[in-house]
Amino acid sequence: FDAVINVESSHCYGNMAQFVKEVSRVLKPGGYFSWVDLRSKEMLAEMESAFNLVELNLIHNETITKEVIQALDDIHERKMTMIADNVPKAIQTAFRDFAGVKDSQIYNAFQEGKAVYLAKAFQKVTL
């Protein structure tokens, strides 16, 4: 592949290191891997070690937690309205948590610095 894009899903993978190895395997030399996701502070070291492959050269590394919080704030009311109007009351709390609205677990973790949102880009080394 010329490019692999992974957005907000790798935190659910059982083996991040294996995922990164597979990305490296399927990328053509010179290909790009773009990744954005969230991590708890406790998981950062494990995640960083998964990215430490000789074949992948880090070309962009940015913490975008502040921007994500701002985006969540900007769409808070719209999400709350959509949930109230379209989701059965019995499961609205779960939807609010999943949506990251204000006072949800993930929103509070970002605010308190217990979780971060990261953006990285890599290029596969050309041999």
Feature-to-residue mapping (PLM):
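Hydrophobic adenine-recognition pocket in adenosine-nucleotide-binding enzymes
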Residues: 9
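Conserved Class I S-adenosyl-L-methionine
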Residues: 65-127
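Conserved class I S-adenosyl-L-methionine
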Residues: 32-54
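A conserved beta-strand element that flanks and buttresses the S-adenosyl-L-methionine
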Residues: 5
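Conserved S-adenosyl-L-methionine
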Residues: 56-67
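Conserved acidic residues
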Residues: 2
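A short glycine-rich, Lys/Arg-flanked "PGG" loop and its adjoining helix->strand segment in the class I
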Residues: 17-32
